[in-house]
């Protein structure tokens, strides 16, 4: 059901109030009226209108004073002022005090309606943006970072403190370990959360384009610069700029970046005007910047400016306790996105996932699960749904056999080991199916499916 917009009409002339109230009521508005500024303030506090239409010249309290009083308590509701005096000074003062717009009497009702509709549309957009910011802030809370790893839990605790500061941050780690995720979490938990978060990959652009992308350029600064263009430093003002793959930034641009970190100012390419910015810089790299400093390929002074706080993210192979957690998260995500009813990953498949070294880290795990979801036709992901390099036959718990075998023998070997693992865990848990499913990292429903497939009776274990 569409919400009814509430309008507050304030005018000391009875005929104007009646005319406007009738006109907006016919358009579906809930109308409220006041004949002076003081009464309007009481109604404003009581009914919380979506828009206010108010005359400027009124006894007791004029529209400008009433507007100032409204703005001292609440700044979001659009206020449109009406005046019979076509005075530029009055209009300027009204806008300076926070009016959305003003109209001059006598006015055309259609024109006034357009102004009111524009005010409501803008208000709706602002409300949606606030909700999006709130949703982003909620989705990037520390509790939403999936981990059972003590090392990652410590990083999350440290990062929560870092977010409250204004210090530059350097995030190191292999590709796919979640450097951008941590950078976003810092931003959305900081005082800059309502500002922009912008990412640029320093390795993705050649030097000339990267400079233009970062610093912007004036019209005519170089061939093809037909218009003025703001750079990312300018667009990230009051927000956060993530410089990904900072180790790939050319030395000449490193010097310009150092100035921004020190002075918070720069000039566009081809420009002479110094532009001040208020931004937080987060740099990310999968390279050893200290080694690059020794080699002379990275500026030492820039390294120390960026390295105020250094976070080192562990690779996925060093946080194996997170693999099943992340795999199940990606399973739910991609099943929903692809409208598939895939409910679980079977124990043998999960064992293979846990044993794999994951050179591509979390990004590789995400891709593997997405592929399995897309290609699978049943309710459970099995070992044969995994890529060949992962689904190698298991000799015993934790060991992967590397000798090549035929596809037929591979499936038989996987099923044999899977059955043995289920029986061993069932025996350890004294036939308790709920605890067995928990230990195997699968749902009770998936365990029942496997018990039936292999003809295992928990009472016989």
From Swiss-Prot:
Modification type 4-aspartylphosphate: residues: 55
GO cellular component, one term: cytoplasm
Observed phenotype of the null mutant: Deletion of the atoSC locus renders cells not motile or responsive against any chemoattractant or repellent independently of the atoSC inducer's presence.
InterPro entries: AAA+_ATPase, CheY-like_superfamily, Homeodomain-like_sf, HTH_Fis, P-loop_NTPase, Sig_transdc_resp-reg_receiver, Sigma_54_int, Sigma_54_int_dom_ATP-bd_1
DNA-binding region (UniProt annotation): 433-452
Pfam families: HTH_8, Response_reg, Sigma54_activat
Biological process annotations from GO: phosphorelay signal transduction system; positive regulation of DNA-templated transcription
Name under which the protein is recorded: Regulatory protein AtoC
Organism: Escherichia coli (strain K12)
Phylogenetic lineage: Bacteria, Pseudomonadati, Pseudomonadota, Gammaproteobacteria, Enterobacterales
Gene that specifies this protein: atoC
């Amino acid at each position: 059901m569409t919400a009814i917009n509430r309008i507050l009409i304030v005018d000391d002339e009875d005929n104007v109030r009646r005319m406007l109230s009738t006109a907006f009521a016919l358009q579906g508005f809930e109308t409220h009226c006041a004949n002076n500024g003081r009464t309007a303030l009481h109604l404003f506090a009581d009914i919380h209108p979506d828009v206010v239409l108010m005359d400027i010249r009124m006894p007791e309290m004029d529209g400008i004073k009433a507007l100032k009083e409204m703005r001292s308590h609440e700044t979001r509701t659009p206020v449109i002022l009406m005046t019979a005096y076509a005075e530029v000074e009055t209009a300027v003062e009204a806008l300076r005090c926070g009016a959305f717009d003003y109209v001059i009497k006598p006015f055309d009702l259609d024109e006034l309606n357009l102004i009111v509709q524009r005010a409501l549309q803008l208000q709706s957009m602002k409300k949606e943006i606030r909700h999006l910011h709130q949703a982003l802030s909620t989705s990037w809370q520390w509790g939403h970072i999936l981990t059972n790893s003590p090392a990652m839990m410590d990083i999350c605790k440290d990062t929560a403190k870092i977010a409250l500061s204004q210090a530059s941050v350097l995030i190191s780690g292999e590709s796919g370990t979640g450097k951008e995720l941590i950078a976003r979490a810092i931003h959305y938990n900081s005082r800059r959360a309502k500002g922009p978060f912008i990412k640029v990959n320093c390795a993705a652009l050649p030097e000339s384009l990267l400079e233009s992308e970062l610093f912007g350029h004036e019209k005519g600064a170089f061939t093809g610069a037909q218009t003025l263009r703001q750079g990312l430093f300018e667009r990230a003002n009051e927000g956060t700029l993530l410089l990904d793959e900072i180790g790939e930034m050319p030395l000449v641009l490193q010097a310009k970046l150092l100035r921004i970190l020190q002075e918070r100012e720069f000039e566009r390419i081809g420009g002479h005007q110094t532009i001040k910015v208020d931004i937080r810089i987060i740099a990310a790299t999968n390279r050893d910047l200290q080694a690059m400093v020794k080699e002379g390929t990275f500026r030492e002074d820039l390294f120390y400016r960026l390295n105020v706080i250094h976070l080192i993210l562990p690779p996925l192979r060093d946080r194996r306790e997170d693999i099943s957690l992340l795999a199940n998260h990606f399973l739910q995500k991609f099943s929903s996105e692809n409208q598939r009813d895939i409910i679980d990953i079977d124990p043998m498949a999960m064992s293979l996932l846990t044993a794999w070294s994951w050179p591509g880290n979390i990004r590789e795990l995400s891709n593997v699960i997405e592929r399995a979801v897309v290609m699978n036709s049943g309710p459970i992901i099995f070992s044969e749904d995994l890529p060949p390099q992962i689904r190698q036959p298991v000799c015993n718990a934790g060991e992967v056999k590397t000798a090549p075998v035929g596809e037929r023998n591979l499936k038989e070997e996987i099923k044999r080991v899977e059955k043995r693992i289920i029986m061993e865990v069932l025996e350890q848990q004294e036939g308790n199916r709920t605890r067995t499913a928990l230990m195997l990292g699968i749902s009770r429903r998936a365990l029942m499916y496997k018990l039936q497939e292999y003809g295992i009776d928990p009472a016989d274990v």
